[in-house]
Each structure stands twice: as structure tokens, then as C-alpha cells.
């Protein structure tokens, strides 16, 4: 089946689902090459239908929060649901207590809410008073990786062209495997760079 990622905010008792995303894990075009931490993603996923959403809300999302609380593990924060869409319905592949990368890069820019208010509601246990809203558009993220990733790759190579994105609305450059060198130039410092 298809994999879909869904991020959520949790305050210990209430869960608020963000919009869906779908990432591409293979290092090369055409779903070829080794698995990676993610080479790109888009949101929303066309495979995360209203029917899938209803199923997950009924059997997965709130049930997860309730089960954690029942076990004495009340959770506040972010839950990332890695789902597999099968003929028998959605199945949970993984849970992560963090934002997903690169899924977050296409989900949060579409969110209309003030994220600080949402985080405060998670901490205060008032998430039930928040309704998440998202732009009615799509977002795409393409990861720029060092040659050779996910195996061997060079570090310390200068990155050029970042000024191209200054003053561009709705364009973002998210840094991952980068750093400033001794001269103050942004250089590569990992496999998934931007």
C-alpha cells in the first residue's frame, strides 16, 4: 500500500490532527536507490481521503492517546503517525514523538494557527479549545543532498544561490546538514543538506 504521514498535537487527553503528507524515501528518481531519511515530500497526500481520515480518527488517533493515558503514560507534545494504507484499511507502521523531516516542512507552512498558542494549549491541557486550520493549497519540499548520500559524501563544500530566495513569498529554504565555516560561508555538513 501507500505510506502516508500524519502529524498531531497532543495535550495528554485531546489530539488535534494536522494535515497529511507523503514523503519519498528512496535516494534516486523513480523510487530507486537506498532508503534515506526522506528526499522530498508533499502535502496534502491525495491518498489520505476523507474515508481514511474518518477511520483513523475513530480507531487510531484518539485511541492512541487514550491508551497511553490508561497505561499511566500521559503524553503531551507531537505524535507523528506513519501509516500504511492497505485494502483492509490504514495500519500504523510507526509512532514518533517528534515532528517528521521532511514532512514538517510542507505541513507547518500551510498551518494558519499561531504555533506558540498551539504549543501552550498542549502544555496547559486546553487543546480542546483549539481548531487547527490549514491553507487550502499544496506544498512541496525537495531535499538537496550531498553527492553519494546516503553512503559516503563530502562535507565542507560551499553552498551558493541561497540569496535567490530572499524576498520570495511562499518559498522557504530549510537548513539541515549545513554549518558556517571559519570564514562565515555556509557549507555542507551532512547528507541531506537543504
Predicted regions located by residue number:
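Active-site "cap" helix and flanking loop/linker of ATP-utilizing ligase/carboxylase catalytic domains
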Residues: 57-79, 96-168, 176, 181
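Short clusters of hydrophobic/aromatic residues that line enzyme substrate/ligand-binding pockets
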Residues: 39-42, 159-162, 173
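Internal nucleotide-binding/catalytic subdomain
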Residues: 1-107
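Internal helix-turn-beta structural module
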Residues: 170-194
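Hydrophobic side chains in beta-strands
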Residues: 8, 85, 144-145, 175
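Hydrophobic alpha-helical transmembrane segments
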Residues: 17, 167-171
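A structural signal for short secondary-structure junctions
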Residues: 87, 134-136, 166-167, 186-192
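Short, well-ordered beta-strand elements within core beta-sheets of diverse protein domains
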Residues: 41-44, 142-143, 193-194
